[in-house]
Curated annotation (Swiss-Prot):
It comes from the Bacteria. It holds the Pfam family DUF494. This is Protein Smg homolog. The lineage of its organism: Bacteria, Pseudomonadati, Pseudomonadota, Gammaproteobacteria, Alteromonadales. Belongs to the Smg family.
Length: 157
């Protein structure tokens, strides 16, 4: 499923190509690209849920906790997000790339993925996908894109 999300992001969203709106046409294209129908449906449902989280008009769980509260991860979240990934999320919050709400959306989307070996690089892509879908987060998206694609120049000290 994550491979399909990456394919869609790289070929449609990140490349700024016109997004195919027709669900059946998109499914057919992904099938021709070699993806299985069941995985395609899961990936499209994942994207629909991401869009739903961004467009909620009612109070959500994101509005319940105080903005300055400390995030306590569940056992399942700690299994999926290793200490390096959790530290990276905190780093992004400290930089201002993520705020309380976007961090929670990222965690929600990570937990719904069926990727057995979720890595820090996978997390970075999920963050980028989430930020792309949040209105008003263009600067955070650009900053995250820079973090994802920047090449280290010279030795790190």
């Amino acid at each position: 499923m994550f491979d399909i999300l990456m394919y869609l992001f790289e070929n449609y969203i990140h490349s700024e190509m016109e997004v195919v709106v027709d669900h059946d046409e998109l499914t057919n294209e992904l099938t021709r690209a070699g993806f299985r129908h069941q995985e395609i449906q899961k990936a499209l449902a994942w994207l629909e849920r991401l869009a739903d989280l961004q467009q909620m008009e009612t109070k959500s769980y994101l509005d319940v906790a105080p903005q300055q509260s400390t995030r306590i991860y569940t056992a399942a979240e700690m299994t999926r997000l290793d200490s390096q990934s959790r530290g990276f999320l905190m780093y992004l919050e400290n930089l201002g790339v993520l705020d309380f709400a976007t961090r929670e959306v990222v965690i929600d989307r990570v937990m719904e993925l069926e990727t057995p070996n979720f890595t820090l690089d996978d997390l970075k892509w999920v963050v980028l996908m989430v930020l792309f879908n949040v209105p008003g987060q263009e600067a955070a998206y650009d900053q995250m894109e820079g973090l994802l694609f920047e090449e280290a120049e010279g030795p790190l000290h």
